[in-house]
UniProtKB/Swiss-Prot annotation:
Function: Catalyzes the condensation of ATP and 5-phosphoribose 1-diphosphate to form N'-(5'-phosphoribosyl)-ATP (PR-ATP). Has a crucial role in the pathway because the rate of histidine biosynthesis seems to be controlled primarily by regulation of HisG enzymatic activity.
Protein name per the record: ATP phosphoribosyltransferase
Cross-referenced HAMAP family: HisG_Long
Gene: hisG
Primary residence: cytoplasm
Amino acid sequence: MLRIAIQTKGRMHEKTAVLLNEVGIRLPAAKRTLLIQSNTFPAEILFLRDDDIPQAVANGVADVGIVGENEFHEKKQEAIVIKQLGFSHCRLSLAIPKEEEYPGLHWFFKKKIATSYPKILSAFLKKNAIEADIHFINGSVEISPGIGLSDAIFDIVSSGSTLISNHLKEVEIVMYSEAILISNKKLDEKKNKILQELIFRIDAVQTANDKKYILLNAPNDSLQEIFQILPGMKSPTIFPLAKKGWSSIHSVISEKQSWEIINKLKNAGAEGILIVPIEKMIL
């Protein structure tokens, strides 16, 4: 049984729950408790505060965890980063009052900076030879300059709307962050085998995220031109149609390129083009 620590609530919790469902880890519909066992995968889910997850994994309270890179780097716990998960993207940035002119990093010299991430900020300032006064605040960092607690802040930025509503502007991006899968360094063979299955399933879901399944009909004399348009994984699948001289072609394309590819296929004589989502892809 593999114990997976995830965030108790919030946006990352919601997206983590979606990922777990996509990889086949479904939880009972009963009221959530601190620890729940999956009925479809040899795992149990431990619900924790996001800043407690790195330590829980490092200490073996949980075997693996899903947490933001920002929390992992701030806590500096002895755990292994297995992979980035592609959601809950944000950045850790320095922000100052919007009316201030910003000539560069030296603006922060001897300034008071409020943050919930003192270790990351301290390392950044030291690297850039900036001496500043770091004030640790656990939450609501963005209000600090407005009430006179600090001159600037160092905090998570997603859309930037929170900064705007507090009359702040982002001036330096220190690091980018997203959800990551971390693991305890000393998993036994049985737990490691379950972890490898989990990684395999996550890879299958991630690979499919930007892919679409495409089906189309085309005259046989256009097949070679169409093959040049379709990237595919190896080569397109072809089925003869009842209509003489025509074939049905199946392949996989990138969603980002789908409209460009569709236009090229139409110009090459393709008809009846269907684009279908892919849930999982095993390469």
